[in-house]
């Protein structure tokens, strides 16, 4: 677990967040859907998973974690964290937790979207 962030760490996170959100918008807005699949979202989630995993598995310094993992990738995609944590469960031999994590994330996120969708239609 990372220690509590100071103002410099928060600046790195905020700067990274600006970069990640800008990249996500740029990529997602320029890619067409492929057979109804939002290719932009799929692309940023896939790339984010790769980059987050590469940085996490390589034990980068805290400043890189704040800027890239939390800042850039946190706003670029949250799926990268989900993918990494789910893979880690499998790697650690926690097979039931691996499948349960996938199930709960997918179902709860879809449920949340459904709740918001129907709440806005009332």
From Swiss-Prot:
User: Where would one find coiled-coil regions in this protein?
Assistant: none
Transmembrane stretches, start-end: 1-21, 37-57, 64-84, 98-118
- Recount the known activity regulation: Na(+) is not transported, but it plays an essential structural role and its presence is essential for fluoride channel function.
Give a GO molecular function annotation for the protein. Answer: fluoride channel activity
Binding, Na(+): 74, 77
- Write down a Pfam family by its short name: CRCB
Protein's cellular compartments: Cell membrane
Q: Does the keyword Ribonucleoprotein apply?
A: no
Question: Where does it primarily localize?
Answer: membrane
Q: Which UniProt keywords apply?
A: Cell membrane, Ion channel, Ion transport, Membrane, Metal-binding, Sodium, Transmembrane, Transmembrane helix, Transport
Q: Which reaction does it catalyse?
A: fluoride(in) = fluoride(out)
GO BP: any one term: cellular detoxification of fluoride
A GO cellular component annotation here is: plasma membrane
User: Which cysteines are cross-linked by disulfides?
Assistant: none
Membrane topology annotation: Multi-pass membrane protein
Role, per record: Fluoride-specific ion channel. Important for reducing fluoride concentration in the cell, thus reducing its toxicity.
Family statement drawn from the similarity comment of this UniProt entry: Belongs to the fluoride channel Fluc/FEX (TC 1.A.43) family.
> What name appears for this protein in its UniProt entry?
Fluoride-specific ion channel FluC 1
Say which species the protein is native to.
Methanosarcina mazei (strain ATCC BAA-159 / DSM 3647 / Goe1 / Go1 / JCM 11833 / OCM 88)
The gene is: fluC1
